[in-house]
């Protein structure tokens, strides 16, 4: 069994988003996204993976189909097809932190 404490591994940069690898196995990757206020993750996808997004702290905006946007908030979880391009942005004053699970299909 492996164990991590978020406050021990979180890292924020005012210049770019940071993905902190937490756990990796043959089929699964677990990452902690640390997105400082005012930053945006460049558009990207994870082909061949199913992806869950679980916001832990702060809020961020995620563009979705048809030009709509959703607000990612703690207490919610989202499933994203890894082939879909996504790029969360944090226009808010508080830093944003999100747990990302990538599960190989």
Task: Please place each PLM-identified region on the residue numbering.
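Ligand-binding loop in jelly-roll beta-barrel domains
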Residues: 82-105
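Short, charged/polar surface micro-motifs in flexible loops or helix N-caps
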Residues: 27-28, 37-39, 57-60, 84, ...
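A short, N-terminal "cap"/entry segment at the start of jelly-roll beta-barrel domains
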Residues: 1-29, 42
